[in-house]
Amino acid sequence: MRLLVSVRGPVEARAALAGGADVIDAKDPARGALGAVSAERLAAIRRTVGAARPVSAALGDAHDEVTVAAAAAAAAGAAFLKLGFGGVTSEARAQRLARAARRDAGAATALVLVAYADWRRATSLAPDHLLAVAVETGAAGLLLDTAWKDAPLFALVSPDAVAAWVAAVRAAGLFAALAGSLSGADFATARAVGAELVGVRGAACVGGRKGRVSEARVAALQGLVRAPPSPTLSLGVLA
């Protein structure tokens, strides 16, 4: 399992790097769950990180093909782009939006579709329906996140349900990532359900998700990611 840390600028990127994050994710928490940073800010983050780690970027929630394509083109060159579908309830429309992002991101940049655990509240597609969209559009992976940040992922969806979703994603040949107000205490559960990547913002910050990324907090989280799995941990005791 790998650790993704969301940063809003080059200063935080340096802290995340120094703390040992595996993926540096460009995101503006003031603009929502998938708030995009400016093209200039993304470029500064990429210069700071260089070749040391992969850089991902949030594109926000998709609304129309022109805007999505422009955002993807501006972020081209990142290792992967995260695209949400808040307000999108049609699989056909989601496919059109995902294809627009994939086309303009370029062949070297992968696309990760973001499903919301609180999908009804976000007026979005259910996570299993978004898996079908990902398969049809050639996405590289799926991230299960929360649109609203007032409850953590495993408070909204049981570990057993997440495990079944992760298994379906991986069976389709895609990578499965988890986020959504996760703390270090959730990492053992994330590992047990089969997640390949965990994404955090608030847990890595001093002062919450709108605070600043702390090198020490990232290092502590990475220690939990790398900790050997507990032989006694199972989904049966987590459910």
Task: Label each PLM-derived region with a short phrase.
Residues 23-34, 76-90, 141-150, 193-217:
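Glycine-rich phosphate-binding active-site loops on the catalytic face of alpha/beta enzymes
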